[in-house]
Swiss-Prot record:
Highest taxon of the lineage: Bacteria
Stored NCBIfam families: PRK11028.1
Identification of the protein by name: 6-phosphogluconolactonase
Reported function: Catalyzes the hydrolysis of 6-phosphogluconolactone to 6-phosphogluconate.
Record-level GO BP terms: glucose metabolic process; pentose-phosphate shunt, oxidative branch
Protein family per UniProt: Belongs to the cycloisomerase 2 family.
UniProt enzyme class: hydrolase
Gene Ontology cellular component annotations, sorted alphabetically: cytosol
Enzyme nomenclature, EC number: 3.1.1.31
Length: 334
């Protein structure tokens, strides 16, 4: 099984395309020069397109993904603000862009060729939205707003319009700073990593996906850590057994085991990373985790122990300058 790994390096305006084999080895396939500082990335649900947010000319660059994982530029569309995080709906019809510094979220349609078009809606006055996450039902968009300690909820219509959900928001602990989210593969539980206190909140999803209730909040840091907390990313393995978060000050990944129903997580350890692990991802087999070192200009591959979730460092690889984002495309037959 071979997968493609994409690493975005904004300071050198590049995407490095790697092939990941079943032993966890990476082979460089392509280095793509991007028209701007490349930051968030998202892969289409059919795994045939890569979407990339760029600045200072705010926009989305669409790429076609070849069978071997290499990229060909297919178009560029504007955005109303600097893209901080992007996501598509689960049918690949719309792209959502959260702009932290511009306090907005926009929706852009995706045409039948998989190319993102100009936005059709913009939601303003959102206090520092750090991500835009479509729920498992493809009906609700969840937007963690870091500066108000809330996760906003919006209904998504078939036409790509967002309106406030009946449960308009989820309030998190004061000063927590909600940032990125992940969903359990059973579609019944959501997780949110909080940037400012490096904690993870666990939400039970009920009423046919319509309601979110906090069931657990857990510190992700070592007990003796006294520095400034600065969490960044969160991902769960495809089998739902292990959850990971990164913290950029401590240069580590927090490792959690997850109960069978997804509702209870337990911190079982930490693993040191490259300097400032801004982004990471887990491959589709659930065997490997790849993290970027924003200050080391390298990525590192770790093997996931299937019995404990613990990580073993395999190898580090040079990439562009200031790598921030890691996206992984599944094997051709996946």
């Amino acid at each position: 099984m071979k997968q493609a790994v994409y690493v975005a390096s904004p300071d050198s305006q590049q995407i490095h395309v790697w092939q990941l084999d079943s032993a966890g080895e990476l082979t460089l396939l392509q280095t793509v020069d991007v028209p701007g500082q490349v930051q968030p990335m998202a892969i289409s649900p059919n795994q045939r397109h890569l979407y990339v947010g760029v600045r200072p000319d705010f926009g989305i660059v669409s790429y076609h993904i070849a069978d071997d994982g290499t990229l060909t530029a297919a178009g560029m569309a504007p955005l109303p603000g600097s893209p901080t995080h992007i996501d598509t709906d689960r049918q690949g019809r719309f792209l959502f862009s959260a702009s932290y510094s511009f306090n907005c979220v926009s929706i852009s349609p995706i045409d039948t060729h998989g190319v993102v078009q100009a936005p059709i809606q913009q939601l303003d006055d959102l206090p520092a939205p750090h991500s835009a996450n479509i729920d498992p039902t493809n009906q609700i968009l969840l937007v963690p707003c870091l500066k108000e300690d809330k996760v906003r909820l919006f209904d998504l219509s078939a036409e790509g319009q967002l309106t406030p959900h009946a449960q308009a928001d989820i309030t998190v602990a004061a000063g927590a700073g909600p940032r990125h989210m992940a969903f359990h593969p059973n579609h019944q539980v959501a997780y949110c990593v909080n940037e400012l206190n490096s904690s993870v909140d666990v939400y039970q999803i009920s009423n046919n996906g319509q309601e979110y209730h906090l069931v657990q909040s857990l510190d992700a840091m070592p007990a003796d850590f006294t520095g400034t907390r600065w969490a960044a990313d969160i991902h769960i393995t495809p089998n739902g057994r292990y959850l990971y978060i990164s913290d950029r000050t401590a240069n580590l990944l927090g490792i959690f085991t997850v109960s069978e129903d997804g509702r209870v997580i337990s911190l079982v350890g930490h693993h040191l990373t490259e300097a400032q692990p801004r982004g990471f991802n887990i491959d589709h087999s659930g065997n490997f985790l790849i993290a970027s070192g924003q200050k080391s200009d390298h990525i590192e591959v770790y093997r996931i122990d299937q019995n404990t979730g613990e990580l073993t460092t395999l190898k580090r690889y040079p990439v562009g300058k200031g790598p921030m984002w890691v996206s992984i495309r599944g094997a051709q037959n996946s």
